[in-house]
Amino acid sequence: MVTIHSIEEMLNYYISLGGLRKDAVNGFRYVFPRQHSKVRFWGDLHGFSAADADFTYPKDTIIRSQFSQRYVGIGLSEQGTVEAYTQRDQTIHFGEGVNCFVFDSPVPFFMKVPGGQRLRFQGLYFQEQFFAENNIPLYDSFWRDAKNTIHGADLHAPELVSIYRRIEQCRLTGLAFDTWLKGFGLEAA
């Protein structure tokens, strides 16, 4: 089992799997030559970010995540499945399509991924800090309500797919890209 408490630990985990960090326009990526895999990031991983992954775990893996900051993740999955749970008797299966995950407390969250399975997905991630930095007021029960309504749901959200595609294809760089991406985060939130 792998335990991850922060974004930095997640990035170090990629390195432990043989990932080589490379700079990319408006972000960075990890390439995994042995697995012919990659994970690409845009934006502020502690605020609003986007990711593109084409990754094959070399062996069966259980990841125990216990982040201190709450977040919403929206995955646009093209291939592969992941089993997720906070309690084994309440599992969620994330598969092809638009999936949503709400991490609303410091309770450990587990993801079980079969080895040798190719995972291809894009993601949009909204950390709690993003809402605070942009003065987006969240009512007291926002995180609990979000978890009760969209957590684990297969969503029909073509506008989110469109936002991801536009991020991926954007030709802006530097501060112009950062400002543009923040605007897209605000639009999506």
Regions found by a protein language model. Name each.
Residues 124-134, 148-189:
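An amphipathic alpha-helical interaction segment
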Residues 1-30:
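Short Lys/Arg-enriched alpha/beta "domain-start" segment
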Residues 6-9, 137-138, 159-162:
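Exposed alpha-helical structural elements
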Residues 12, 16-19, 136, 144, ...:
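Generic surface-pattern signal
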Residues 28-141:
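N-terminal regulatory/effector-sensing and dimerization cores
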Residues 142-148:
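A solvent-exposed, charged loop/short amphipathic helix patch at secondary-structure junctions
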Residues 2, 41, 151-155:
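A general boundary/transition motif marking the beginning of the first structured unit of a protein
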Residues 11-15, 34, 51, 64-65, ...:
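Bulky hydrophobic/aromatic packing residues
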